[in-house]
């Protein structure tokens, strides 16, 4: 199990894969235990990635060194409790998101990013305020999200329930995506399977 209780950090990455890179090969990530994160009074521009896969990547589709993601599995329960948090950019919980100008695809060379969530996801956000006016300000919980300028192919399977209890204020550009898939891309979209229930309060 992984338990984190924190206050003021510019970014929090727990039990997942995160990358900001020009060229990078991602590896496998298996979370077999429970993940719990509790924060209060988080600073602005905070970037949360909890039990998930996140990438901000640039590369050339013809370059062998371009980003190549692999697999992420969460078998335990992922719980995130945020109170009085100020989040400037992103909140990702047990999902998959990519801001990428590189190809992420199925082929003999490139494996697709695959996220399997077998445990429950419980997300609580109270009085959280988004401060970034950009369109990348987002909440992604148990699903797929992408801003992609090239070919992309993802698989995401959510086998259990996703529970979200949230109260926040945000800019007009902010959006929330729970247990599904969303893409803003010049090419392919994604594959997403969700066999559990989604509850939003």
Language-model regions, residue ranges each:
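Surface-exposed loop/turn motifs in large extracellular/passenger domains
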Residues: 1-201
């Amino acid at each position: 199990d992984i338990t984190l209780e924190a206050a003021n950090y510019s970014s929090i990455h727990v039990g997942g894969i995160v990358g900001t890179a020009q060229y990078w090969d991602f590896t496998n990530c298996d979370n077999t235990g429970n993940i719990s994160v509790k924060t209060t009074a988080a600073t602005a521009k905070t970037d949360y990635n909890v039990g998930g896969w996140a990438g901000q990547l640039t590369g050339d589709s013809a370059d062998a060194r371009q980003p190549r993601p692999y697999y992420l599995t969460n078998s335990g329960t992922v719980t995130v409790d945020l109170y009085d948090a100020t989040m400037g950019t992103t909140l990702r919980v047990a999902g998959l998101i990519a801001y990428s100008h590189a190809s992420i695809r199925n082929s003999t060379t490139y494996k697709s990013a695959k996220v399997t969530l077998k445990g429950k996801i419980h997300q609580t956000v109270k009085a959280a305020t988004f401060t970034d006016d950009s369109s990348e300000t987002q909440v992604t919980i148990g699903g797929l999200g992408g801003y992609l300028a090239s070919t992309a192919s993802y698989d995401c399977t959510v086998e259990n329930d996703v529970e979200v209890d949230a109260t926040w204020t945000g800019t007009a550009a902010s959006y929330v995506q729970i247990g599904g898939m969303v893409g803003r891309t010049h090419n392919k979209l994604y594959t997403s399977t969700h066999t559990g229930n989604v509850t939003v309060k």
